[in-house]
Amino acid sequence: DFYELFLDDAVEAAKLLDITLTTRGQMDGVPIKMAGVPFHAAEQYLARLVKIGKSVAVCEQVGEVGASKGPVERKVVRIVTPGTLTDAAFLEDKETNRIAAVNADKKHVAIAWASLQSGEFKTKLTTADKLADELARLQAAEILLPEGKSLPDGFQATSANITRLNSWQFAADAGAKLLTEYFGCQDLHGFGLDLSLIDI
């Protein structure tokens, strides 16, 4: 069994992973480019892609072969990004893999970070002039930013990968709702979080 990539994804993966690029079938008379990795070795290839800053969506077959005409139904079952890699086999010894998010309003800059390995998550309000130092201390593998926002000039994101998301994904009320639903609680005071602040 293989995990397969097609079209531009196949071309890029073949180059990055040094795997064979081939073709399967045609689309509008043009051969469809394809590359693949063995199922048993997929995690190693996945880790290599993530370590160089790529995000990977893993799809699995969910339909029965031959149950209907056309391709077998597939669904995304896992998304792995630089900040969400948790397998200890692919992390350096004692390395804590963190994902961080940065947002700002007129008064504060908020940082939220988490380690999916340990389940730890924290937030902090700081100022623009201290943000670069805070991010350097965290050594996050991935930093989430709202579209149109940038990190301070003094911060060199050499070890972190920047992922830009829609601004609405940084709304404090939406963050509070997600967290209270996830933890099954009325509010987040027990976690030291104030719903009125942007660090949620």
Name the predicted role of every residue range.
Residues 1-198:
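Basic, polar low-complexity surface loops/patches
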